Curated annotation (Swiss-Prot):
Residues 14-208 form the KARI N-terminal Rossmann domain. Belongs to the ketol-acid reductoisomerase family. GO terms for molecular function: ketol-acid reductoisomerase activity; magnesium ion binding. It comes from Haemophilus influenzae (strain ATCC 51907 / DSM 11121 / KW20 / Rd). This is Ketol-acid reductoisomerase (NADP(+)). Mg(2+) 2 binds at residues 217, 389, 393. Pfam families: KARI_C, KARI_N. Substrate binds at residue 414. Its cofactor is Mg(2+). GO terms for cellular component: cytosol. Involved in the biosynthesis of branched-chain amino acids (BCAA). Catalyzes an alkyl-migration followed by a ketol-acid reduction of (S)-2-acetolactate (S2AL) to yield (R)-2,3-dihydroxy-isovalerate. In the isomerase reaction, S2AL is rearranged via a Mg-dependent methyl migration to produce 3-hydroxy-3-methyl-2-ketobutyrate (HMKB). In the reductase reaction, this 2-ketoacid undergoes a metal-dependent reduction by NADPH to yield (R)-2,3-dihydroxy-isovalerate. Keywords: Amino-acid biosynthesis, Branched-chain amino acid biosynthesis, Magnesium, Metal-binding, NADP, Oxidoreductase, Repeat.
Amino acid sequence: MANYFNTLNLRQKLDQLGRCRFMDREEFADEANFLKGKKIVIVGCGAQGLNQGLNMRDSGLDISYALRPEAIAEKRASFQRATENGFKVGTYEELIPTADLVVNLTPDKQHSKVVADVMPLMKKDSAFGYSHGFNIVEVGEEIRKDITVVMVAPKCPGTEVREEYKRGFGVPTLIAVHPENDPKGEGMAIAKAWAAATGGHKAGVLESSFVAEVKSDLMGEQTILCGMLQAGSIVCYDKLVADGKDPAYAGKLIQYGWETITEALKQGGITLMMDRLSNSAKLRAFELAEQIKESLGFLYYKHMDDIISGHFSATMMADWANGDKDLFAWREATGKTAFENAPKYDGKISEQEYFDNGVLMIAMVKAGVELAFDAMVASGIYEESAYYESLHELPLIANTIARKRLYEMNVVISDTAEYGNYLFSNVATPILAKEIIPNLQKGDLGEPTPAVEVDNITLRDVNDAIRNHPVELIGQELRGYMTDMKRIAVAG
C-alpha cells in the first residue's frame, strides 16, 4: 500500500486539502432517518466507540459491537463496556455479514488488521466508516469498490461527545466521503445521518475530505494541542521551582492553569483570554508570544511539512513495526519529569490568580494557536478546519491535564497523537528552556506583572493585532454555532 495523498497530482492534492464547507442546519432536517432500520456494527469499544454508540442508539439506531473472540472470551474492558451498557456483542463472523454499516473505531495502528478481517465478511453494497482518516490517507488502505467509505470525526474526546449529547447538544464534527468509494452516491447521506445520530449537527458540521481531516488533525495534536502543552508544562514547572516557588503550588498552577486560561478561549477566543489580564500584563504576554513565535515558528512549519509529505506517518509506522520502542521510551521519560511528580497542593488558587500568575502560559497558548493555524492555512487547509484543529480543541485537551497531568493527556489521546506530541515536545522543550526561560522578567510566571505606564497607542495597536488575527475572525463566526457550550473548567 502507498500513501494515498502522495498518489494524487498537485491539483487533486489542493482540491482535497481545501475541502471545507460549513453545512446549513437545514441540511440535517432528516437527522438520522437515513440509517434507521439498518444494522450498524461498531468495531472497537473504547472511548469513541462506546460513546458514539450510546448516542447513536439513543437516536433510534440499531447498534451492536463486533469484538475479537479473545476479547469476548476473556471479558476484556471493551467487552465489559459494551455489555454493561446493554449492547449486543458478537464476533466479526457473527455480526459483520448482516451489517449495513460497519464503523471502525479501533486505534489507528489496528486499522489495517481490522480491514483485512472484516472486508471479506461484509455484504455487497454495504458501507464502512471511520472517525479518523489515517488508514485511508497515510496507510493507503484500498477498500472493496462496492463498499461506500465515509468518515464522521467529532472534534472532541469520546467522553465529551456523550456528555454534550446528554445535554441535548453535540460537538463540532467533520464529515467526508472517500472519493474512491462512493459507488451508489449515498456516502453523504450516510455521513450526515451518522453525524446527526451523535448530535454533531447541533454544534456545527463541516463537509470536509479524508485528506483535510487527517492533515489538519495531525498538525493540531502534534503542536498546540498536545506538544505545546507538554513542553510548556515541563519548562514552566522547572522555572517556578528554580525561582524558589513551592513545588506543590507550582504543580497546581500548571496542572489547572492550562484548563482555566483556555476556558476563556472557548468562550471568546484569544481576545477574551488576553482581556483577562491587566493592561500591563497583556502587553507583556503579547511581547512574549512574539518571542515564542520567533523561537518555535520553524518547528511548527517543519511538522506541517512532514505531515503533508508523509514523512511523519512513515516514521511512526516504522516505530509500530519496531514494537513502539520510541513511543514507550518517550512515555516513560515523560513519567519521570519533575512536573509529573510534583506534590499535591491543598491550597486554593482563584480563577484570576491563574491568569495573573500565568502570563508566560498565556503567551504560549497565543503563540501556539496562531502558529498552528497559520501553518495549516499556508498549506492549503481552510480556516474553518484549522480553527477546529487548533483553538477549539485546546480547552478539551487542557482538561485532561487537570485530571492527572500529562499522564492523563497521553492516555486519552490516540497513540498517533501521543507519538507526534513527543516528536514536537522533545525539540520544543530545550528550545524554550534555552531561548525563552532565561530572558523572563519579574511577573512573567508565578506572580503578577508589575504595573507600568501604558501608552494608549501601543495598547490600541496590540488590541487590534489580537482581534484581527484570522483565527479570531473565523472563530467568532464559528462560535456563533456553539452558543450553548457548557463550562468545562473544574479548577479550584
